Amino acid sequence: MLLSDRDLRAEITAGRFSIDPFDDTLVQPSSIDVRLDCMFRVFNNTRYTHIDPARQQDELTSLVELVDGEPFVLHPGGFVLGSTLELFTLPEDLAGRLEGKSSLGRLGLLTHSTAGFIDPGFCGHITLELSNVANLPITLWPGMKIGQLCVLRLTSPAEHPYGSASAGSKYQGQRGPTPSRSYENFIKNT
């Protein structure tokens, strides 16, 4: 069940669903707007000949932190990792779904490539997979509304929520745009 604005506020007031910093003006009829942080991960195209999800490639991306008032320009065809300004903590019976903003989609900005689902039990900043599919550069401003989080109530609490020992959670507690840890999904034969 998708939570309404009243349900979202009730969960926040009860302390079960946490957003930091919380701004009540970001609550929409059935979602919460999320804002862009000032940190980005850019790909180092000259360090690797290709991306291999099975290998740890520590220098594949570099962290860029903007100075106050400075924008990030995402060029046509460009892809960069960003993150939400807000830190989210979901209880064991709520999950999230990150969606783009219609106004930005109409400009050619995609907020996430594939990973829009947030498991119950997650705590951290949400990493954004930002792509420019327009034919002109797009200016990204820290603090701007970049997407919206829909919150869904599970039929029962998760038995093994995100962050539990058996869940294999790789991104619990992440701060800023976190690079892929896909290599952890591959079994090492040593």
From Swiss-Prot:
The record marks G116, F117 as: Important for bifunctional activity. Its EC number is 3.5.4.30. DCTP binds at K101, S102, S103, L104, G105, R106, D119, T127, L128, E129, Q148, Y162, Q174. The keyword Nucleotide-binding applies. Residues 166-190 have a biased composition (Polar residues). It catalyses: dCTP + 2 H2O = dUMP + NH4(+) + diphosphate. The active site is at E129 (proton donor/acceptor). Residues 162-190 are annotated as: Disordered. Pfam families: DCD (PF22769). Homotrimer. Belongs to the dCTP deaminase family. PANTHER family: DCTP DEAMINASE. HAMAP family: dCTP_deaminase. This is dCTP deaminase, dUMP-forming. It comes from Mycobacterium leprae (strain TN). The lineage of its organism: Bacteria, Bacillati, Actinomycetota, Actinomycetes, Mycobacteriales. The gene is dcd.
